[in-house]
A protein has these predicted regions:
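A cross-kingdom feature marking solvent-exposed beta-strand/loop segments within repeated
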Residues: 4-6, 18, 23, 28-38, ...
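A short, sequence-level motif marking secondary-structure junctions
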Residues: 58-61, 133
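Vicinal oxygen chelate
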Residues: 5-13, 34, 44-47, 53-54, 67-89, 91-133, ...
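Short, Lys/Arg-enriched, disordered terminal segments
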Residues: 1-3, 133
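Short, charged/polar surface micro-motifs in flexible loops or helix N-caps
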Residues: 49-53, 60-62, 87
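Active-site segment of metal-dependent pyrophosphate-handling enzymes
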Residues: 40-42
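A short secondary-structure junction signal
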Residues: 20-21, 57, 129
């Protein structure tokens, strides 16, 4: 089912400062901020040779990231995203094995591809995002 690691998402309190650190101090290729209103976040992608880092910050108080900051005042790792070849097949396998999918249907993610999130309770406390290749 799992293919490659697509990205690791880090919730940050100051998106501009975090992006500057990755670009100016760590020398990484940093993308432009991208609002994702359907997910309630603004994201910046850091391009690395073998994967990406996604810096995320809430768009408002209704954002799931806003709730994350209630528990993690300074931010931190929010989720890990893996690619799958067939998201619908992956969802069926997961549901048949009683894993919880957050939300009813896939949404279009920041890369323009369908994504789902898997509840952390089935993955040792880690929020997992699956993105169709």
């Amino acid at each position: 089912m799992l293919e490659r690691l697509n990205h690791v998402a880090i919730a940050v309190t100051d998106l501009k400062s975090a992006a500057n650190t990755y670009r100016d101090i760590l020398g990484a290729k940093v993308g432009e901020p991208l609002d994702q209103p359907e997910h309630g976040v603004t994201v910046v992608f850091i391009e690395l040779p073998n994967t990406k880092v996604e810096l995320i910050t809430p768009l408002g108080e209704n954002s799931p990231i806003f709730n994350f900051f209630n528990k993690n005042k300074n931010g931190g790792i929010h989720h890990i995203c893996y690619e799958v070849k067939n998201l619908e097949l992956s969802m069926n396998i997961l549901m048949k094995n009683n894993y919880k999918i957050i939300g009813d249907n896939p949404k279009i993610g920041a890369h323009g591809k369908p994504v789902i999130f898997l509840h952390p309770s089935g993955f040792d406390g880690t929020l997992i995002e699956l993105q169709e290749e």
